[in-house]
Amino acid sequence: TENIIIDHCSFSWSMEENVTMYDNKYTTMQWCILSEPLYVSKHDKGARGYGAQWGGEHSTFHHNLFAHCVGRTPLVNGARDKSASGHDAFVDTEIINNVHFNWGNKGALYGGQLHSIVEGAYSRTNLINNYYKPGPATNTFQDRWFADCSHDASSATGLGEWYIDGNMFETNEYKNDKNKGDHSKVNANNWIYADENNSKKAVNLRAGIDKINEIKLTAPSAN
């Protein structure tokens, strides 16, 4: 599936993710609401309640609202297809200007792995200018982060690349996390607490400000 825009839609009450996308190309989701997935329904894995699984080659996810999801806001699929002729091998993902409210886990977003065996495959994610506001269901863990770039990376075939900048946590919302509710440092520099020293972590290969033009979408965007 190619050349798709999903605009001004609402998605709720799913048993797993409210929206799941993969094997797609040139896709934009904009100005949508993804909220209230069912936490305990009839899923054979038990409690779920996720926002979205976002995949495909050359995709943009902007100006959307995630509300009242346990996690996966979104799960970034990355380059996941392990067949030699597989799709989703050359992945550029933009996640920009979204609002994340009242997620349940300590990490609102994760993924971006590189699992494809296609020669030259890559997974590049731009996470820019998103706003994170904890709510009543947000667990008050010691740590809280924008993105778990290392998720499942120990089984990956290579490292994903991330450009992360301009994302903002609501400050002073909760006083008992690692930063005592003061997120001014990480708001000023989203990489300040990043672990870049573990070879199993996808964040080990990060795309700096000098590479932003290289990893932006070069294919025609749908928005």
PLM region descriptions:
Residues 2-13, 25-44, 50-76, 80-105, ...:
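Right-handed parallel beta-helix
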Residues 75, 89-223:
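Extracellular beta-rich repeat passengers
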